[in-house]
């Protein structure tokens, strides 16, 4: 799955007078490592590095990074509050109708996190199970589409708030509140110290 940085089609930055740089405001949740996270006051991650590199030598633009909840990033771009969204966004046709995407910067498969001793190899295996996702994400769209088209018991989808990070969802699995959660496969290496998760 290609992971990209996106911007609103035709969205304009804050206007400045002649000779002054225009500000490009970049929205991120700062909680999607390794793509976007904060170290002290510094914005770090692949997406952040990409944006910084693009505007590094610009005489016309300066970049301002803003941390905001995930579910407010694209609405902020739509309203003109932000010009770029940099948050491990994946490409889909619906988004492509509204936003301009960068070239892909990474590729990874989805991975399922579940309690130790369980194994799922397809979406069909998730029939009747319970998971938790952020609304508007590709994970949510994938599950919603499966529920709409599958001839099996639907997957129960709980929609988490933007403040519910992956570590919290993993805790919910450990507590038995959830059956499983989704992430990118390469992110599993960062979870290697978490016990009772497969």
Segments the model singles out, each with a brief description of its role:
Residues 29-30, 106-114, 185-189, 193-198:
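Periplasmic-binding protein-like
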Residues 10-12:
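Bacterial signal peptide processing site
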Residues 17-88, 162:
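Extracytoplasmic small-molecule ligand-binding "clamshell" domains
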Residues 4-8:
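C-terminal motif of bacterial Sec signal peptides marking the signal peptidase cleavage site
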Residues 52, 64-125:
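Acidic, polar ligand-binding/catalytic clefts
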Residues 38, 51-60, 139-163, 192-196:
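Ligand-binding cleft/hinge of the Venus flytrap
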Residues 72, 87-97, 144-146, 171-198:
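A ligand-binding cleft/hinge motif common to bilobed small-molecule-binding domains
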């Amino acid at each position: 799955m290609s992971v990209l940085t996106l911007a609103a089609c035709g969205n304009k930055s804050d206007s400045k007078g002649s000779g002054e740089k225009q500000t490009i405001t970049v929205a991120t949740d700062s909680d999607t490592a390794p793509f976007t996270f904060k170290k002290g006051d510094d914005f770090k991650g692949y997406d952040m590095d990409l944006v910084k590199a693009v505007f590094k030598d610009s005489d016309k633009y300066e970049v301002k990074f803003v941390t905001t909840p995930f579910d407010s990033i694209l609405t902020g771009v739509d309203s003109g509050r932000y010009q770029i969204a940099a948050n491990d966004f994946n490409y889909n046709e619906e988004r492509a109708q509204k936003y301009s995407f960068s070239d892909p910067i990474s590729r990874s498969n989805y991975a399922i996190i579940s309690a130790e001793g369980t194994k799922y190899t397809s979406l069909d295996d998730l029939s009747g199970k319970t998971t938790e996702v952020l609304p508007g994400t590709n994970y949510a769209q994938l599950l919603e589409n499966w529920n709409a088209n599958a001839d099996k018991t639907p997957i129960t989808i709980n929609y988490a708030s933007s403040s519910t990070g992956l570590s919290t969802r993993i805790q919910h699995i450990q507590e038995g509140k959830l059956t499983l959660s989704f992430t990118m496969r390469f992110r599993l290496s960062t979870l290697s110290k978490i016990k009772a998760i497969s």
